[in-house]
Structures are given as C-alpha cells and as structure tokens.
Amino acid sequence: MADNDRLLSIIERITDPRINLTDKNTIDPDGLPLPALTNVGMGTVFEELLRRFNEENNEEAGEHFTPRDAISLLAHLVFEPVKEDLPKIITLYDPACGSGGMLTESREYLLDLGVRSAAIQLSGTEINPETYAICKSDLIIKGVDPSGIHWGNTITDNSFSDKSFGYMITNPPYDKSWKEDKKKIYHEKMLLDHRFELTLTNYIGEEEVLDSTPRTSDGQLLFLLEEVDKMKPLEFQPQGSRIASIHNGSSLFTGDAGSGESNIRRYLIEKDLVEAIIQLPNNIFYNTGISTYVWMLTNKKKDNRKGKVQLIDASQAFEKLRKNQGSRNCTIEPYRTDILRVYTDFVEQEANEELKVGSKIFDDDDFRYYNVTIECPLRLRCQFNSLKIDEMLYDSSDIEVSKWLYNTYKDRVFSGLDSEIPAIKEYLNDQEIKITDKKLNKLISAKAWKDRQRLMNAAKVLMKDIGTDVYMDYNLFSTKVNATAKELKLETSAAELKTICRAMSVTDSKATPVVKKEHKANSKDVVMLLETYGVPEDKLSDYGYHLVKKGMYVEFESDSELRDSEKIPVKEDIYDYFQREVRPYVEDAWINLTQTKIGCEISFNKYFYKPTPLRSLKENERDIIALDEQSQGYIKSLFELM
C-alpha cells in the first residue's frame, strides 16, 4: 500500500471519528451513538468486502473468487482421509492463492482437528498486487505469519524451487492466456523450466523427455504440474502429499494425443497420482456458471486405490440459495458429507433423486488410448493438358494473387517487381487480402517466375512428344515423362519432372496406386517394423508394405485427403481393432504404425450420461387430443380431409 501511495489515505479513513472499528460503544462528533464492531460483525464485513472486491477484480477470463463452501469441501477432501495420521509439521501451499481463502479455511479445519497453530505453515503465490495485499492483511488480522505468501508469477517464477509441501489446495485461473509468460520460460524454442518437462514412454516403450506445456490460450494445467513438482517425497513425509485442485472441463479432454494437455493427463494417470476427479455443480462461483472439477492427487495411494481412478458426479448435489450472488445461485454445503462419504468409502453408486452423488471406479488404462493413423493409397489419373500447363506459370500457394500480378504487370514479373511493392500492397489492402511480407516477396520473386516459366515450357515440349493420352497408372506416366525428357535432353531435374507429372494429375479412385518406394526385405524400414514394432512378416501389407516378389516390398504413397485417425483404447490390440472396424469398409487401407501416439482424456459425459427416455405413443396421443380440444376440433378435421 505504501508503494502505491495508499497507506496514508487508508489510515486516515480507519481513524475517522465517524467510524467505530473498536469493540466498545462510542459517540461520533455529532453526538450520535456508534455501536461497537463485534468479531462476528467484523467477519461479515470482511467477507462481503472480499466478495465484492474479487467480483470486480477478477475480470479476466478464468479468474474466480472461490466461495467458502467449495473451499471447505476441498479442505475436507484433502485432510479427512488422513486426519488420524497427520505429520508433526503441516506444510500447506496454494500456487494461486488469491485472497488466501484456501489457506485460511484449511488452517481453521486443522485447528478444529486439534492441530497446534505453530505446526501449520502456510505458503502461497499471488500475481495480482491488490489481491496479494488482501491475503497478507487477512493473515495478519488472524494472527498468522504471512511471510510464506509471495507476490509473483507461478508460471515464470519458481519461487519455491527449494521447497516441497505436504498438502496443496488451489483454484487456478482457467481459459486464461499465458502467451507473454511463455516467452520468459523459453530460450528461442528451448524450454528452460524443468517443471513442465515430463518423461513419458512412446508406443514402442522408449522413454522421451517431452515439453508438455499446453496451448498458450489456457495455462491452468501448468499449476497442476507446479503442485506435482512440489510434492514431498515419501522419504521426507511417509504419509505422502495430497493435492486438491479445481479446474474446468477443458483440463479433462482438451488436446489431441501428443499435445501438452494430453501428455500432462497421461503423466498423472501413468504415475498413478490421480485418486479421484469430482464434478461440482454449475453456478457455485460468483462470476461464472461453468462446470468445474476437483482433481484429487496423492503420491501415496491406499492399496485398494492403486491403479484406479474414481470419478464422482456431484453436479446435482446442491441446494438453491434464496438470493443469487452474481452468477452463484446454489451451495454444496448440505451435500458435503455425502461427497466425502462416497470419496472416502471408495464405492460405486448411481445418482438418483435420493442419492445426489454418483460414483464410478475405473482402471488407469480406461482413459488412455492409441491415436493411430490410417492411410489409403494415392491414386492418380494423368494426362497432358494445355490449360493445366498454362496454370504452371502461377504460384500454387496463391494462384489468384499470382494471376493478378501477371495480368497487371505482364512480362515485368520476370525482371522483378520490387518497385511496385507499395502499389501491390495498396491493391491487397483494398481487396482485404492479408499476406505477410515474406510471402509477398516470394510471390514477386523474379527467379521463381523464371523457374515456373521454364517448367511450363518444358511441359509443353513433353506434351508435344507424348501427346494427350490418359494414363490410369501414375507410375507408367512418370516413367514415360522421365524417359522422354532424357531423350529430348531437357535440362530438368528429377524433382522438376515430378512437379510436371503432379501438375498433370488428378485423383481418381479407379487409378492404380502411386508407388512411393521399393524396399528389400532387409531394408531398415522393413526391419524396423518386424523387429522394433513386432509386426508379423505375413501382415506387413496391413502396415503399408506389399510383397511384390520374394525379398521385395513396395510402399505406396498415401493420399492426405483420405488419411484418418482412430482412437483405440490401450486395452485393445491395434491390429484386431483395424481388422474389425476399418478393413471391412476400406479394403486398401493400412496402419501407419510409426506415427502412433498415446493420448489420455477423461469424459464425464461419456461415463455419466443418462439419455432422456422417449415419450410413449399414448403420451403423444393424449397431448394431441388436448391440443385438438383447445383448437375446437381443427386438428381432427385436418385428419378427416386426408
């Protein structure tokens, strides 16, 4: 407050003789009585100011002041299962502590259990200076040492790098960009922060150290990695560390296999850190109505929980408030005991009108899947065509602009258009065409225009010699073009001749597959499939290598337009799935096994979805009759006319 010139005005305000903040009744300068401010009154005022301040201050997406009933639930979830075996010193950490509610509520819970105040150490980080000041003030008011609260950025500043904690509770911001933060933890493309690097195995069991940062539009899972990084090793705390972290739905399923989000989920599941995930009711926060989920993590699971994850659906476990508080219109307080019971008992149960909390238990592998790429061969019909040859003059990356350049500047494109850049940019701006300077320089490059003109002229010479016959086999067409170019002594490279062939080709499902490469049986690609991936020799064709004669395989080029991917549960064999779900419908498909990635996602809708039963014919008939009575027989008369 002193740094921001606020301290003096605050002191003047609280010492105003017209305000009574003491515990004794008094009289103001005008002789009017000023009642004492009781402890209860002070607490009520403070909570209301906190709520209002946070509603106004948490304007950015994903920043939410956590209500007390949610904090209380998290405190119980963290400590209830281990309350009989707490360590002598309890270290509690919140990497996004806000106004400190998570920490102080957990402290109150521990005090109620009989834990000594001196045995509780609170730590936290908060990026917002005003909220940080409120957190420190709250702790001071409560007589708690505030030195463990740091002002800083949890993502960029690993301020507790030399510490670990036994218990962590947080509600980090979600759907909030961390684009600027990312620049500070990278040197060019190299990640500098070990917290966000994870060691995972690939499909063939090789360990890889992966950059597992999520997309820059949402950094919530980085806070979860921060907490995992700060877990106390079992040799320092045999009871293990426990984490309760609130996130929105994107933490469960956003990101394809191999993405940062998916890798984070994989790591947590494969390391068997996830005890449970609990879906909370909507509209329990003050400024958002989104679905939220509590991730419960520990590095010391009970034996019956090992290799398992419990999903708890508490979305219907709420009681409506008499009056809305912003977006908040309900409380989970009356159902806290039910949620705790289902969690601590580790039982499955169906939610219904009487039991508002549902629970299902899964194996860790139920959430992991193989993302398998399925390929189909590229089939091309080939024919020399004057129109296609003329099109070769233009840049294929932006034919329309390239055509405009040629139509406007004619043969000047071959000598350079640098002097015309301002006029070209003005045209592009008028047409609302957005092109980077790098791409524009490529489009006006005199060398590129000359190279394309040379290829176009070569194609005309080839067409004159080869003719316009249709080839349904690209391989024969390519062989013919290469042989003719050699006979005519055209100064064209193999890559340029391939460009000409492709320009004269279109996809055709009836054409012969395009051969990419021929392989001997001892080639590294074939050996890798046989030995590293364990593919049986008689099934190589299902993996893209077709036997054409003894000791020789042919590999077809894949058609990117027909490429597909399949999510196959890790409990299922990829080949069996392919034979059952793909082969019957696409005869020439194959598995691109080397591109296989392992992903992880958790879908509450999938596991707890309850379809709405269809209405019976009797119910529909009854409603139609009722409507007919309201319309004085009009509906019935329509049916009589039919």
Language-model-derived ranges and their functions:
Residues 1, 23-33, 57-65, 360, ...:
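Short coil/turn segments at secondary-structure boundaries
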Residues 15, 46-54, 75-79, 107-108, ...:
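Amphipathic, well-packed alpha-helical segments that form the structural scaffold of globular domains
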Residues 35-39, 60-68, 210-217:
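Short acidic-aromatic active-site loops that bind/stabilize oxyanions
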Residues 4-8, 12, 39-43, 47, ...:
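Non-catalytic, well-ordered alpha-helical scaffold segments
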Residues 162, 167-636:
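A conserved structural/catalytic subdomain of Rossmann-like adenosyl-cofactor enzymes
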Residues 60, 64-170, 174-190, 248-250, ...:
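Conserved S-adenosyl-L-methionine
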Residues 51-58, 203-208:
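Short glycine/proline-rich turn/loop motifs
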Residues 1-54:
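Long recognition/docking surfaces used for binding and targeting
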